[in-house]
């Protein structure tokens, strides 16, 4: 089940998020999910 979350980002972080999401063909929400999953995998090593 998906839940809604509201976050506050600096302009530069938001611009980077939008650019990365656009380049990968993902929504901002999906981009954040991918980034968190990748971070989690990196921490497990």
Swiss-Prot record:
Q: Which UniProt keywords apply?
A: DNA-binding, Plasmid, Plasmid copy control, Repressor, Transcription, Transcription regulation
Q: Which domain of life is it from?
A: Bacteria
The induction comment states: Represses its own synthesis.
- DNA-binding segment(s): 16-36
Keyword Acyltransferase on entry: no
The molecular function terms in GO held by this entry are: sequence-specific DNA binding
Listed GO biological process terms = plasmid maintenance; regulation of DNA-templated transcription
Gene3D superfamilies on file: Met repressor-like
Which GO CC annotations does the UniProt entry carry?
Answer: protein-DNA complex
Note the SUPFAM superfamilies from the entry.
Ribbon-helix-helix
Tell me which InterPro entries the record gives: Arc_rbn_hlx_hlx, CopG, Ribbon_hlx_hlx
Task: Report whether Transcription regulation shows up as a keyword of the record.
Answer: yes
Its family remark reads:
Belongs to the transcriptional regulatory CopG/NikR family.
Q: What does this protein do?
A: Regulates the plasmid copy number. Binds to the repAB promoter thus controlling the synthesis of the plasmid replication initiator protein RepB.
Q: How does it assemble?
A: Homodimer.
Q: What is this protein called?
A: Protein CopG
Organism whose genome encodes this protein: Streptococcus agalactiae
Gene name, per UniProt, is copG
């Amino acid at each position: 089940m998906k839940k809604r979350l509201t976050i506050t980002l600096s302009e530069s972080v938001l611009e980077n998020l939008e650019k990365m999401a656009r380049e990968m063909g993902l929504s901002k929400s999906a981009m954040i999910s991918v980034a968190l999953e990748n971070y989690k995998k990196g921490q497990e090593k």
